[in-house]
Structures are given as structure tokens and as C-alpha cells.
Amino acid sequence: MRLLSSNSMTRSVLRGMTLGAIALGVSATATAQDPEEWFTLGGDFAHTRYSPADEITAENFADLEVAWEWDGASFKAVSGRSTPSLIDGKLFTVAGNKRHVVAIDPKTGETLWSYREPDTPRGEYSMRADYGKGVGFARIDGRGVVYIASPGFFLTALDADTGVPIEGFGQPVPIDGFPRTGVVDMLADLGHPYDPYEGLPLETGYITSSSPPIVVNDTVVVGNSAEQGYHQSRVENVPGDILGYDARTGAFKWKFNVIPKPGEYGHETWENDAWEWTGDVSSWAPLSADPENNLVYIPTNSATIDYYGGFRPGDNLYGAALIALDTRTGERKWHFQMVKHEIWNFDNPTAPVLLDLDMPGRGKVPAIAQITKQAWVYAFDRITGEPLWPIVDKPVPASIVPGEVLSPTQPHVTKPAPYDMQGITIDDLADFTPEIRQQAIDALANYQMGPLFNPPIHAGNDTGKFAAMNCPGGAGGANITAPAVADPETGKLFVSSHKACFALRLIPGEEADLLYPNTTGVTLSEWANAGPGATSRPPRHPAGIPLWKPPYSRITAIDMNTGDHSWMIPTGETPNRIKNNPALEGVDVGNTGTGALVPMVVTKNMLVYSDAASDGTPMLYAINKETGEIMEQIEAPARSSYGMSSWVHDGHQYIILQTGSTLTAMALPGAQAQSSGGH
């Protein structure tokens, strides 16, 4: 067992943000746009998901039709997590739990080529197999190269025209079926003993990938992920160190230690020698970059085991942080830790968004904005790391769980204002009628309500409560299924969020271990998550409605030049289960929103989002970017998930919906192709 000595309980607190030596400069390339290109899964290096395409307007939006559908069933595609890149007249994406790489004709939807990595146990085991999200891309000597990080944690470089592995890239992999060139075994560069075929021993930990690499100038930067922290009951794992490779040769360039080693900045934030044997801190979310300044931005997740960290006392840097690294060397330029000693599942869920702002009294500012599950936008100068508005440490509740020592303070954003509910009190509960309000109060009687950083509680605690309410919970606020989007011409950020409270309850580690077969590590944690999913049994309203006041989901427009909210709208329509609920008969509930996070894309003329009508009919909405008003709405074949995109091909604008196992291309009638689509 890992035991805490008495002196290991002494806390060492570091400022959230520190600076290294940085050359000053304002990038004009991170947010550069070409309507005929969608370069990264976020559209550009800045992850704005913006297109200057303007063929689709409020006047013709109702004329949109399905131009083609690409069916990924033959690749066993399910989730729709991957946003295709449009580069040099081809779409590139990944599909299925084998993470097939696929090139698609953007006019017809026909498959041009596909590539699949040979099967390995280390790839088969990945709990993030169908999480690929997209590809990386670079032009090497005029040749297009597609890069993919696989579930088995191999980096592969493919010819963009043929799908053939690139000659002279990487080293031969000693596994039958692998190409002799074009592949890098990235496990070798993490520094842990492993078997090339089987991967890391589960007793040591597990590393996989859930987002694509990003190619910044001549460096391929790769993040990674581990198993979901709410499925863990043992304390050992490996850190998800960030890796850099030569884009031309695949040669290893650098590694950034996300859990600092002795002598490195932040090492003292890991007490009990936890840096030696625990892990998980990584970047499962996508990365963004400022190529002109050779900077890549790493949004990190939490350390091992969601909801309990008694075995890893300290602030646990660089968990739940945003890190700026020099792409040439991997050197840290600055960082900010959003949550110290993170135990709420408040990992950073999306790539940060880069904007070039014009701030009153300050002029031009190269900015970066990180949306979070906790309903704050953390905004910084992306070159220096200085917050655009003060972020102040404030006291937060202590834990009553034996062995858990939380940070006494957490950073609080002062501007922009939160874009959704933070914490929960009686005043936040549904009050359509006095009876409904009392029923909501009664439903929460056995739950510990509290502020944003309300800590989990354990079974058998002295309060007699079943669980602690965590609002927002680990599903957001904002989350990966609906990344924020931005208009670089105006500096407006559009954030999709929903009220998604979790109930946090811990049980003894030996009991939790029975819920999670094949978990990593060997030593049982004293406490672990009591639910088979991310939350324990939540409270329910007897009327079958949410316990809290609407809106249940929303889009908030934030002017990042000033930090002020411009407008807020509920998303979709009030579901029939609420609109026609007998308990609400005669009550005008207004538009509550569906409660779902909504994928969005921004164009020259509008904000577009995907949600549903009251009866569940999938809908596509065109929104006025300045006012939030609905300009038009149409039925769609299905709801999009994890993102949307828009670009121009052959003179016509398309909107791509990620509809589960398919991709659906919407366009005006003039763009209709003769083909009905590919695989």
C-alpha cells in the first residue's frame, strides 16, 4: 500500500500561471482562413471552426438539401466523433474502433482510399478506440502527408494521394503485417518497459490516443489519453507525456513531462512520491497552435482516479492545466492550472480557441480562450500567458473523506461571467409551481448541495447524505461533444453548454474494484467512484422533469474583446416530455432548451447549430451572430455530434454533419452530385 507519512501532508502551493522566456510577436497565421480548406478538425490551428464561405445565406438556408452521405458502416463507424479535414480537394477522416484512415471525394462522397493499421492487443484494449476525432496534415516538399495517432499508440504518415505509408518515415515495427516504413512506435519514447505487440503491462498503466496529432511547422505534436478516471480503483498509472517528432522523418525530437520529475518545475506539487507511480495527466482533448510563434497549446486532464486523490497530496501540476510549449524544443513557455488537486472530473475538454482581439484601452492582443466543464472561459495573452482579466484564488470547501486533503483555494475567473449554472442551492431548483418546487427540494434531501467546488462524499459519512451534488458535473458545462466556435472577424466566442449535475459518492476501493475489471495498476485506492459510470445515482424529480430551472441547454455569445456576454439563447425546442407533462398543465414553461450540447459552425453569414424540435425531429438552425435570433430552421437527416464543418468545393458551400456512422453533406441544389455516396 502507498502510505502517507505525517510530513507528506504539508502542502506546497504554486501560482497557477508562470512564465518562461518568450519572444514577443502577434500571429496572423493561427486564424488564417481559406474557404476551400478545413485544415484541422477545428478548421484551423486556432480551432475557431469558422469558414469565410458565404454562398449559404438566411434567404436560401431553407433550400439546403442532402448532397451526399458517406456511410462508414464497412469501417464499423459508430460515434461520429471525427471532423473531416478538407485539404487539396480531398476530405480526410478516421472511422471505427480500428481508426481506419479514409480519403473521400468532397463532391460525391465516394471513398478514394483507406488505410488500416494491423491488429494488436495494445490497440484492441484501447478504451478510446472510436475516439479518433480526425487527422493531422503537412506538406513535405510539395507532397501532402496525412498523420494519424492510432488506438495502439502508433504514429503513421500516409501519402495523401494514395494512402500508402511514407517511405523514410519512422522505423520498422517488429510486428507482422506492419509496413516497413511510415510508422513510429510512440510507446518507445515514453520510457516505460513494454512489449511492442502487447503494449504496457496493465499493472504499470495504459496509454492510447483520442485526438489527432497536430503538425506545427516541422514538428508533429502528439497528445494522448488513458482509461477514463471514473473507471479506476487502483492508484498506479503512467503519465501521458507530450511527444514531438520530426514531420519529415518521424525522428523523436522531445518529450514534455506532464508530471514533473525531480529538479523540474512543479515537482514539489506531488507529495507522497506519487510522481513515481501514478499518472493519467495527459491531453485527451485536441491541441491548438500558433505556428508563427512556434507555440502549441496543451489542455490537460486530471491525475489518476476521478473524485479521490488522497494518495497524491499536493496541487498535482500539470493536471487540469493549459500549457504553452515551444514546438521546436518542447520547452514550457507558460502554463496556468485551472484546478489544483483536481478531483471533480474538471479536465479541460476541448482545444483552446485562439483569437486576435482589439481590446478597449489595450489595443491588439493575441489571445487564447479555454472553455471548461465548470462553465468558465479562462482567457490569456497567448504569447505571455498573462490573464486578460484577473483570475483570483478564493477559498473552497474542505473534504470530509478520510485521507483526502484538497487545496484550500481554487482559481476563480472574474471575467467573462460564467456561461451556465455553477453550484446548486434551493434557489436554483425548478419552481414552475409550488408543488414542483417542494418535490425538487424533497428529491435532494439526501444529497449534499453546495458551490462549484463541492467535494465528493463517501459511503457511511457522518452527514448521512448519499452523495454530493456537483454542478456542473463531469459532462459540463461545456464538453468535447460540442466544441466552442468563434468568429475571428469580430472576436465573438460561441459556447454550447448544458446543466448536467453529477452526484459524487465514494465507496471503499475494494468494492469499487469489482465494478472495473481489467483496470490499470495493482494497489487499491482507499476510496473510488461508487458508480459504474461517471456519476452515482442522481436524484430524480417525481414529475420526470429536470430538478433545476431552465434553460437546460444554451448557446452563449461572448465578446472576447470586452469579456461581456452579447446574448444567450436556449437550444432546440422544449421536449414534449416537458411541454406535455401533466404536472405542468396550464404552465407556460417557455423554451427550456432540449438539454443537449449542440455542435456548431460559424460562417461569414451565420452561426449554424444542430439540435432537435419538441418531438425529437433533428433540426438545423441558422442564427444571427449579432443578436442570437433564429433566421431560419430546417429539418435535417440526423443530429450532428462532436462537431460540424463548412467549406467550399467546386464553387459551392457545404455543411458537413457528423451523423453517427455516416457523414452527411448539406448544400444548395446547384451543388448536388450524381453519386449517392461512398461506403
PLM region descriptions:
Residues G25-S27:
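N-terminal signal peptide c-region/cleavage motif recognized by signal peptidases
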